[in-house]
Amino acid sequence: MKSGGRAAELENAIEWLVLAGIVSHVYGLDTVKKPLDNYKNIDSFKIFVSDVGLLCAKNNVLANDILYASSELNDFKGGMTENYVCSQLVCRSYECYTWFSEGEAEIDFVLQREGKIIPIEVKSADNSKAKSLSIYTGKFKPEYAIKISANNFGFTNGIKTIPLYAVFCL
């Protein structure tokens, strides 16, 4: 939800869903500095469902549509993939944040790990160019960044590539 949305009206309901473990809050960051929690913008956040299966059931997405890469799902696939990654990160006890610059770039997840701030870009397609990650790394100079996609493991130009099936390894 962006600033000016209906977050204030829904605050109690959202908080209940978070405390029940049904959804996760991913707050936007005003700036990227340690500790990240001090720079979260409580008026700008994304909500992710904790169970991707429930998300698919709610949207009438069949297993065959996913298994056989139905082109009808192209618009839904990115959000579903981000939701899957968020649920895996939360299961590993990471506090997730997001970062965006107005109209220029958006990093799906930013987390603090072993004293480092790590940007994570999630791509659902094989063609996994990460323009936003390039903008972020140019601006904040992280030690490394992570791109999660359908591609295999790799490390190029300070970007670790991790396949979707291995997100639990983070």
Predicted regions and their residues:
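Short catalytic-loop micro-motif centered on adjacent basic/acidic residues
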Residues: 98, 119-122
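Accessory nucleic acid-recognition modules appended to NTPase machines
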Residues: 1-111
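C-terminal helix of von Willebrand factor
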Residues: 164-170
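A short local loop/turn or secondary-structure capping micro-motif enriched for an aromatic residue
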Residues: 33, 115, 127-130
